[in-house]
Structure formats: structure tokens, C-alpha cells
Amino acid sequence: MRFAAPLLLIVAAAPLAGCGAAHDPALNEQQAAAAQNRAPDRDKVMADRWSGIFTNPAAVVAAANDFGFKAEGYRASGKGYAATGKVTWPEKPNGIAVESVFEATGPAADRIETVRFTFDVKHDAKPGERARDSYGYVRRIVLGFLSRFEVGPGDTINGALQRRESAKDVQHGVSIVVDANPISGGNAKDRHITVTFTRVGASAPANQTQGK
């Protein structure tokens, strides 16, 4: 009988421990749903995934480098932190060249507030037969980057990327802006396209391009 009291304490404490785990703020929505034995809230799951872009600089740099940007890392720069990289597609000229710059900026080593891709899409006077295959580079890079975090840009932004037009939208706490303009003095089809992802509520300095 002398073991009865401790046994009762253990049994009584078990439900409390379970409740504590279910409400642990360190858990994401999928983990919390599993702990509470319920279906996850899709909006919260997507918000968690988008948040991962801004709370994991190493993963962001790795995702950009998957597409050849060769960013060296998220490092102290000016009044904050930044990672940058450049790449040109395709490797062999075929009537079109896509010069691209990747930038991630933020106020701290563990936090990003803005991710930006800039594309200069330039055409020869008479693009080759393979040039049409290169028109989709901008969209493929942006969607490919986002897919690393299991998110997508939504129909509005996806359509703008397909048409190389300007647009803006907000997805799960993230502002997405596509700014597409002709390149002065270039071919009529040439475009300067900037795709910017900003955490809603980001501070002004993090929204500015480093070094400008």
C-alpha cells in the first residue's frame, strides 16, 4: 500500500503532461494537431511553412543555391544581415539570356524579412528556336524555390509570372510583389522583373536592397 500514493500522483500528472505538450508554443501546427489527436488547420500549416522562409536563413540560401545562385551565406552586412548570389541562364546562348540576382535581407542572423529575385530577360533581335523554351525561366525559378518550403505563390502571382506582368498579393502573412517593366533600349520583349517576398510587418531597413 505504501506505493499507492506515488502511483496516484503519476496517473494524475499524465493528463496534465499531455495538455502541456499540446499547447507547447514550440510546436508547429502539424505537431500540435498530432499531439491533440486532431486534423491540422490548413491555414495554420501554410502559415508555418511560409514562416520557415523567414526563420531559417541557411535553408533559404541552400534553396537559392539549388538554382545556381552561389550565395556564400547569410552574413552581417551594413545595419543587418544579407545573402546575395547571381546566375545567368542558359549556360549556352540560344537567343535569350536571363540574368538573375538573389537577395535575402534581415535584421538578425536568425531572421530574414525580405527575399528578392531580380531577373533581366534579354532577347536577341531574332531569337533562336530554343529561345521560347527559356521564357519560363523566371516562373520556374520562383516556383522551384518556393517548393523547397512546400508553398506556392497563389493564382494571382503565378499568372503574373506566366505573362511577365506586375501584380501583388498576400499569402499567409507574406506580401508578394511582382514588378515587371520593359528594359530601356532593349528588345520589345525584354523585361526587368523583380519578385519580392516580405514578411508582413517587416521593418523598413529590411525592405531595402543592401548597398543601395
What does each model-found stretch correspond to?
Residues 27-52:
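Post-signal peptide N-terminal segment of mature Sec-exported envelope proteins
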